Structures are given as structure tokens and as C-alpha cells.
Amino acid sequence: MKLNELGNCKGATRNRKRVGRGIGSGTGKTSGRGVKGQKSRSGVSLNGFEGGQMPIYRRLPKRGFRNFFAKNYNEVSLGRIQLAVDTGKLDIGKPVDIIVLKEAGIIRRLKDGVRLLSDGELKAKITFNVSYTSKAARIKIEKAGGRVIVPEAV
């Protein structure tokens, strides 16, 4: 098989419907659009128009807003950190912070901080320098002999 022999699978494409080609074709004259009216004209597509009925976007009340000051955190589970320690991606000799987690490949994109969650088990003794930890995660870290440093909010 060569690149020039590639084609669509059988049944993947459908022939174009040729409309307006005489009475005998079955789709002549009005081309399947019926007779007169707004929807028979070209260029009609009224998004949100429901035929004069009050549209849904006006029937429902306005709700909520977007908080531009909201912090967006990278959520990391303890199990994921233990896996990185086991595979040798994470050095436990120095404190673990957002940059160390990024370099280890545990988080992909740097956000406003790191949020530690308690999913999984942690056996390694690690010092964490993160924005937030859940109570259960903090207990597991301290039980393993590690500690958590949470910087104070400015």
C-alpha cells in the first residue's frame, strides 16, 4: 500500500445531494425546503430564535459570576509523589515545592500553587513547601516522618 492509494473507508462518505435540478430529480424547484417563509430563504440560521416563543436564554435568570481573583492550584496526591520517589524521579533530600514537582514531571503546568491531597500512601520522609494540604494528607506526611511548610498569605 502506498500513500497515493489511501482513501476513505467504505461507507465513510456520502455523495452530495444535488438540489434544484428539475422535477424528475425529486429535489427540484424548492429543493426540499417547502414553500415560502423565512426558512426557505438563503442565509437563514437564527441561533436562539424559537419562532417567537420566549427563548431559553431569556427565560432563565442570570446566575453567578467569574471570580478573577480565584486561585487555581495544581492538585497532587501523596500516592503520585510516592510513585515518583519509587521510580527515582523525585529527590527526597531537599524540600519539595512546585518547581521540584514540575521538574520531576508530576505536574505539567505551573499554576498558582500546589494542593496536596491524601490519596494513596506515603512511606518516604519528605519536607513539603506547598500552598495547601488537606488534614488527612498532613497526618500521613507527619506519620511518615516528614513535615509540611505552608507559606503565610500576604
Swiss-Prot record:
One of its GO terms (biological process) is translation. Binds to the 23S rRNA. Belongs to the universal ribosomal protein uL15 family. Keywords: Ribonucleoprotein, Ribosomal protein, RNA-binding, rRNA-binding. The keyword rRNA-binding applies. GO terms for molecular function: rRNA binding; structural constituent of ribosome. It comes from Bartonella quintana (strain Toulouse) (Rochalimaea quintana). GO terms for cellular component: cytosolic large ribosomal subunit. NCBIfam families: rplO_bact (TIGR01071). InterPro entries: Ribosomal_uL15 (IPR030878), Ribosomal_uL15/eL18 (IPR021131), Ribosomal_uL15/eL18_sf (IPR036227), Ribosomal_uL15_bac-type (IPR005749). Residues 1-44 are annotated as: Disordered. This is Large ribosomal subunit protein uL15. Part of the 50S ribosomal subunit. Residues 21-35 have a biased composition (Gly residues).
